[in-house]
């Protein structure tokens, strides 16, 4: 059996894809911080990412010959696609960029891990009812492990967060809470409605199209308030669009698609986003000079890694789900 065949058969394949996604997602935090430090406004980071992602996704869907089917669905379910795109992309990324303007990349990436708990807690409301008509319950074991991962991420933040003013800290926290709730909500609702009809990249194009009214209004306001984006900011947004908007989101959507039949596996996959803290810290160390985390941060980092390992071992011990065994 080749390594590729072994990977395809692995029970923990969704977890690996989730971790790969977290690496590319980490680029977002670092790139946005670099742009903020070089004078670019955070208000343009969000719409530029999705404007630049749109042609890439369209080219992929056109290459597959699926544009007609997607557009037909978009016309039929315009308001549904608009709602999913606005929540999953608009109310996720705009607050995230605001938070990124008030703290270093690794700090924002760490606090962002509250999305893991949000995803688990939202399970009963965002999962499809079972054959008996009952909705899935909150997976208790995965919730405990996810809370442990978030606790580790919080330890990494304590030293740096103490240097922020209460106003900045509160604004950052509220922005991240909105983003952390909107992202799993939009993703799961769209996955529940269209996972059988469209693959992850096709679904991303539909959600991106649905988010355009939000981004057009947002960019119009940004132009009036801060002017046009700089050329350097456009290049930074292009990097984010490719790494995070296409590669990372496609990997993450694929991982959640594979685990969608099991609330426990889905919770474990969403917990892989904690890897963003580690990757953001490494990337920030490589490209941005500044203070680093001390021993408390190291303890938090170890806690995050242990939590991810617990999720991985739990998934490896389960039977392969109908999606995960593809």
Give the ranges of each region predicted by the language model.
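Glycine-/small-residue-enriched transmembrane alpha-helix faces in small-molecule transporters
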Residues: 1-48, 98, 145-151, 162-192, ...
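Membrane-interface helix-cap regions at the ends of transmembrane helices
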Residues: 2-7, 53-74, 150-166, 211-233, ...
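C-terminal-most transmembrane helix of multi-pass membrane proteins
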Residues: 3-4, 50, 266-326
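Helix-helix packing/entry segments at the starts of transmembrane helices
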Residues: 22, 48, 107-114, 190-211, ...
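Specific transmembrane alpha-helical segments of multi-pass solute transporters/efflux pumps
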Residues: 24-28, 65-112, 155, 241-260
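Hydrophobic/small/kink-forming positions within alpha-helical transmembrane segments
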Residues: 26, 30, 85-90, 94, ...
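Specific alpha-helical transmembrane segments that line the substrate/conduction pathway
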Residues: 44-47, 51, 97-143, 263-286
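Hydrophobic transmembrane alpha-helices of multi-pass small-molecule transport proteins
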Residues: 57, 124, 137-160, 294-315
């Amino acid at each position: 059996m080749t390594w590729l065949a072994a990977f395809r058969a692995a029970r923990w394949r969704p977890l690996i894809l989730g971790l790969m996604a977290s690496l590319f997602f980490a680029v977002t935090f670092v790139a946005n911080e670099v742009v903020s430090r070089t004078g670019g406004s955070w208000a343009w980071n969000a719409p530029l990412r999705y404007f630049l992602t749109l042609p890439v996704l369209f080219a992929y869907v056109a290459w597959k010959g699926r544009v007609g089917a997607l557009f037909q669905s978009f016309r039929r379910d315009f308001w549904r696609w608009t709602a999913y795109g606005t929540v999953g992309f608009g109310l996720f990324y705009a607050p995230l960029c605001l938070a990124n303007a008030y703290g270093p990349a690794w700090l924002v990436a760490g606090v962002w891990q509250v999305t893991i708990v949000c995803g688990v807690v939202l399970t009963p409301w965002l999962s499809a009812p079972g054959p008996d008509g009952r909705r899935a319950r909150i997976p208790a074991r995965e919730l405990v492990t996810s809370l442990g991962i978030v606790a580790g991420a919080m330890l990494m933040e304590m030293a740096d967060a103490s240097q922020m003013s209460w106003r900045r800290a509160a604004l950052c926290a509220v922005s991240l809470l909105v983003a952390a709730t909107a992202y799993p909500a939009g993703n799961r609702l769209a996955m529940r409605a269209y996972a059988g009809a469209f693959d992850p990249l096709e679904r991303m194009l539909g959600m991106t199209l649905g988010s355009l009214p939000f981004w057009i209004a947002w960019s119009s306001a940004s132009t009036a308030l801060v002017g046009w984006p700089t050329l350097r900011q456009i290049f930074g947004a292009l990097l984010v669009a490719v790494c995070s908007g296409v590669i990372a989101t496609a990997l993450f959507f694929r991982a959640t698609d594979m685990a969608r039949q099991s609330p426990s596996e889905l919770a474990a996959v969403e917990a892989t986003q904690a890897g963003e803290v580690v990757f953001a810290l490494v990337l920030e160390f490589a490209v941005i000079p500044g203070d680093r985390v001390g021993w408390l941060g190291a303890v938090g980092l170890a806690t995050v890694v242990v939590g991810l390992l617990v999720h991985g071992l739990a998934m490896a011990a389960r039977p392969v789900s109908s999606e995960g065994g593809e």
